[in-house]
């Protein structure tokens, strides 16, 4: 059964459609409605057999129009004009051939040219010109045509059918009536005598109702003899009706409900009492070869252009689809789908001691490197763990900016300040690593705001920074020549502690101003890695010396530093005290410019500072060092007690009123400039 219903595919190469044209023929309006359909079908078949280089087809759904496809030279030859004028029809202007028009014309032309070898019956083409009189099985094919711009696909299915001619008893007519009907030539079987009056009418196999059955042709019928019926069926469908053979012919009036009350006269051989019967077929290749042979002989070319047709058939296959999937309609899994998950950017905190990282001004250049690397897309969630160590330090700098409350504890001026500072730094070094999410959009926005808002401030700070940088460098170099190695080290340690204190106060400033100055510092002082190491060594030495840290604007630091230096070195003159006082005032002016203290690190060689620290550690003994530290701590406690309350109050007022207006900041800068000039005058004197 599967072999009988297997479809074979053949392909025909089409000529260039631009070389063809389609013409619409409109029939005359004078033709009666009862004859319009007959004239349409007759003209189509007659044009096909008159001219072998054209294709024709009735316009679908319109009874008075015909499509004709031809080559452009054939149309210019005006070969159809005489025939069209004979029937009083009109021919419209030619138009471009599209696949739909060509498909209709090919379907009709194939069936018309193949008859009577293959006769259209319903959706089948039954083989044999005597198929109407056959009582047994017959060969047939199902032909479907699909047309594209370049080729034609023919789907051919071979089958076996049985379509026997009807007998009167099949319509449930009584035997006595049938006997009387055969005996009398003028007898008529009326409708009430036909119990089963439904029938199938060729060639469409549509169903109709039998109204009556008779031998003589009615006077109202357009055909007056059996020969007229033969010519009519041959002209319209290519059917070859059975011969006369001297037998009395039987006719039927058929009523079609869709066509109204009008009845149509058919020979009994052109109707069937039952539908077509299908049977399985084994030798389908024989039918295919016979059909293709007739097709090539009847249609050797298309509109005068030769065609190329495949000789071997192609078949549909379902081998690529599994039976269980086909039955249950289970969709196969999609292995190419990717889950769209957005990875969050993280950064890891370092386990290194946070002493130098929290107190030093940190590398601004490294900080900008980290922000640029974070702003770029990463390949995974933990890609931040593979950054360099300097990038981790830069990230801790950004974290200290976001959490200024940690540094505010270091700035508390109390008696246990050194212990509190040491415990805070040690607790920070013991913190376990954490993953802190970094938001790219926020960093990009901060960088954009910094670049836009920092441009007017750069011009203002460039002049003051250049002057103060030159003055401060000369003061430090001159001071190093007069002071001893021990006092020189302590003096530089005080400067670095003041720089660290300025950095801690700088963290409480707005983030926008912080980023502005850091971007300036990156452009002016790119060598930040060397400064970090020097400051780290000095901070270690500073923690051993137990020097108290207070705010820069407190003069108690200056007094304690002077007393400490007088004890260490007796030949310290008032010139050095004046330089230290000027230095403290300079640091007060540069309170919001921590990068100037970074420039001090550039004037001093890092290797020289390391050698000095090592020599000092060798010269001073452990016992003497402890004795000096205890004396200094006792003396500084007595002097700092009345001033600690003032310092705390002033620090509180500074933290509360750090967002003051720009006018008050300018006044403070002017006052600091005047103090710095006075100290320089005393120094020169």
Swiss-Prot record:
Residues 502-538, 635-685 are annotated as: Disordered. It comes from the Eukaryota. InterPro entries: DUF4708 (IPR031643). The gene is C18orf63. This is Uncharacterized protein C18orf63. Residues 675-685 have a biased composition (Basic residues). Residues 518-538 have a biased composition (Polar residues). It comes from Homo sapiens.
């Amino acid at each position: 059964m599967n072999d009988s219903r297997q479809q074979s595919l053949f392909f025909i190469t089409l000529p260039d459609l631009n070389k063809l044209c389609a013409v619409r023929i409109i029939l005359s309006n004078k033709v009666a409605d009862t004859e319009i359909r007959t004239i349409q079908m007759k003209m189509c078949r007659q044009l096909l057999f008159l001219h072998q280089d054209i294709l024709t087809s009735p316009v679908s759904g319109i009874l008075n129009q015909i499509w004709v496809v031809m080559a452009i030279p054939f149309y210019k030859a005006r070969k159809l004009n005489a025939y069209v004028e004979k029937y009083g029809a009109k021919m419209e202007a030619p138009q471009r051939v599209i696949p739909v028009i060509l498909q209709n014309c090919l379907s009709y032309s194939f069936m018309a040219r193949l008859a009577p070898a293959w006769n259209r019956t319903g959706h089948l083409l039954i083989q044999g010109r005597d198929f109407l009189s056959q009582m047994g099985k017959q060969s047939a094919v199902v032909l479907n045509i699909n047309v594209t711009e370049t080729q034609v696909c023919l789907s051919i299915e071979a089958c076996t059918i049985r379509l026997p001619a009807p007998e009167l008893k099949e319509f449930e007519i009584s035997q006595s009536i049938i006997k009387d009907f055969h005996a009398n030539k003028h007898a008529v079987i009326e409708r009430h005598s036909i119990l089963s009056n439904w029938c199938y009418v060729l060639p469409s196999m549509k169903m109709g109702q039998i109204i009556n059955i008779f031998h003589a042709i009615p006077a109202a019928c357009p055909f007056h003899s059996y020969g007229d019926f033969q010519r009519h069926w041959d002209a319209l469908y290519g059917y070859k009706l059975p011969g006369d053979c001297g037998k009395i012919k039987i006719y039927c009036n058929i009523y079609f409900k869709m066509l109204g009350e009008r009845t149509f006269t058919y020979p009994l051989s052109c109707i069937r009492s039952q539908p077509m019967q299908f049977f399985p077929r084994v030798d389908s290749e024989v039918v295919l070869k016979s059909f293709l042979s007739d097709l090539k002989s009847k249609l050797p070319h298309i509109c005068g252009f030769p065609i190329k047709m495949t000789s071997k058939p192609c078949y549909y296959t379902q081998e690529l689809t599994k039976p269980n999937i086909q039955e249950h309609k289970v969709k196969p899994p999609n292995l190419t789908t990717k889950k769209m998950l957005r990875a969050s950017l993280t950064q890891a905190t370092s386990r290194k001691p946070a002493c130098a990282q929290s107190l030093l001004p940190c590398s601004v250049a490294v900080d900008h490197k980290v922000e640029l690397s974070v702003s770029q897309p990463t390949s995974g969630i933990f890609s931040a763990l593979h950054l360099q160590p300097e990038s981790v330090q830069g990230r801790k700098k950004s974290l200290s900016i976001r959490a200024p409350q940690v540094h505010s504890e270091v700035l508390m001026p109390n008696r246990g300040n050194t212990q509190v500072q040491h415990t805070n730094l040690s607790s920070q070094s013991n913190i376990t690593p954490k993953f802190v999410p970094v938001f790219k959009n926020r960093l990009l926005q901060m960088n954009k705001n910094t670049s836009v808002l920092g441009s007017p401030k750069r011009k203002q700070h460039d002049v003051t920074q250049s002057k103060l940088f030159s003055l401060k460098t000369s003061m430090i170099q001159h001071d190093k020549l007069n002071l001893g190695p021990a006092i020189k080290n302590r003096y530089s340690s005080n400067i670095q502690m003041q720089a660290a204190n300025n950095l801690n106060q700088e963290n409480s400033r707005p983030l926008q101003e912080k980023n502005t100055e850091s971007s300036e510092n990156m452009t002016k002082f790119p060598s930040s890695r060397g400064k970090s190491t020097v400051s780290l060594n000095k901070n270690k030495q500073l923690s051993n010396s137990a020097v108290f840290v207070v705010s820069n604007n407190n003069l108690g630091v200056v007094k304690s530093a002077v007393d400490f230096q007088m004890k260490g070195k007796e030949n310290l003159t008032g010139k050095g005290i004046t330089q230290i006082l000027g230095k403290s005032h300079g640091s007060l002016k540069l309170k919001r410019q921590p990068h100037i203290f970074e420039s001090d690190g550039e004037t001093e060689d890092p290797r020289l500072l390391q050698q000095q620290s090592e020599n000092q550690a060798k010269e001073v003994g452990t016992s003497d060092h402890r004795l000096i530290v205890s004396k200094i701590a006792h003396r500084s406690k007595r002097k700092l007690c009345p001033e600690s309350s003032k310092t705390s109050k002033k620090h509180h007022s500074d933290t509360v009123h750090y967002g003051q207006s720009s006018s008050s900041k300018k006044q403070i800068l002017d006052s600091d400039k005047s103090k710095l000039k006075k100290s320089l005058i005393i120094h020169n004197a």
